[in-house]
Amino acid sequence: QDEVGLGSCSVIFVVGNEEGEAKDGYAVGGDRCRVRCSPLGKNKDCETACRKKAGSYYGYCYLWFCYCENVSESAVVWGNPTLGPCLSDG
């Protein structure tokens, strides 16, 4: 029986980074919300979302949202101040 234990949770988002430093973050859909996913961990849907929406070649499902590593410099990821509010939040 598989169980997912989350001892502590933290919200990770990108506001800015040093020049040359790799940028990571949650993929954002057309509604400006994070892209939801399941199952956790390695996830083909997240790999696709990260490639198409963040210019990243590595993504996985973390806390039920697609998280992308080493995204392109021009990519807008969740938490970016220029993004605006998620349109599905009411």
Curated annotation (Swiss-Prot):
InterPro entries: LCN-type_CS_alpha_beta_dom, Scorpion_toxin-like, Scorpion_toxin-like_sf, Scorpion_toxinL/defensin. It is found in: Secreted. PROSITE patterns: LCN_CSAB (PS51863). This is Putative sodium channel toxin Ts35. GO terms for cellular component: extracellular region. Residues 1-22 form the signal peptide. It comes from the Eukaryota. Belongs to the long (4 C-C) scorpion toxin superfamily. Sodium channel inhibitor family. Disulfide bonds join C33-C86, C37-C61, C46-C66, C50-C68. The lineage of its organism: Eukaryota, Metazoa, Ecdysozoa, Arthropoda, Chelicerata. GO terms for molecular function: sodium channel inhibitor activity; toxin activity. The keyword Secreted applies.
